[in-house]
Amino acid sequence: MTAALELTGVFQHVGQRCALAGIDLRVPEGAWLLLVGRNGAGKSLLTRLILGLDTPSAGGVRILGQDLQSLDSRALATLRRRLGVVLQGGSLLEDRSVIENLVLPLRGRLGGRPQMARAARLVIASLRLDGLENLLPRSLSLGQRRQVELARALIHRPDLLVWDGLSDGLDPAAIFDTLAVLRAQRVNRPLTLIATDNRADALGDGCDQVGVLERGRLIFHGPPKALDAALPQRLDLRYVLTGRP
């Protein structure tokens, strides 16, 4: 099966510290991977490498069949048009309304303003964000902001969605709605999802693979049902990731 993501021997140094050490990872097209670990384990740093925002100190990163290190700025920009991205810290334009933020990825792709506005309203409705279209981001709660960021990441139907901090700011009902939208997107096309969180159950039963990062090392990568057996002596880590002793 074609790989949506391949990491080979990836190292990343931050100053004198080795923040990521020898990461090997392969995610098939259409699979859902949840990267989990405690704060500081390297999840966000790895996300930035996957997106080409940082360059690894050593090793290779391939996204949707393309070697990131071999791409010039124009080719990288073209590749990123196939990605949907939700990062921690937020990326909404504070002086633009919700609907203006949502249509940004559609410029040059989907007709004129009426078509773009219709697409934005459809994704707003799917996430139950009706009534927020004309508000500025500063008027939104943290959970609403995160969902608007997700809506913007999905509006152009990306091949790969990268979501750093899956449950950040979202209550259980919002997480349920969000996962329902992602499952619907997955029905007719191979949407690949790479998400990060502190908990291994964040994706529910939609998760195909779990990767566990601990101090910059990938100590487990496999199906969720194999996680407990893979960490028999790490009761502290297992409790943090699953809530089970």
What is each of the regions a protein language model found here?
Residues 51:
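Helix-to-loop junction immediately C-terminal to a conserved catalytic motif
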Residues 68-84, 230:
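ABC ATPase NBD coupling module
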Residues 115-132:
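Conserved ABC ATPase "signature" region
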Residues 136-140:
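Conserved ABC ATPase signature
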Residues 157:
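Conserved catalytic motifs of ABC-family nucleotide-binding domains
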Residues 161-165:
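Catalytic Walker B motif of ABC-type/P-loop ATPase nucleotide-binding domains
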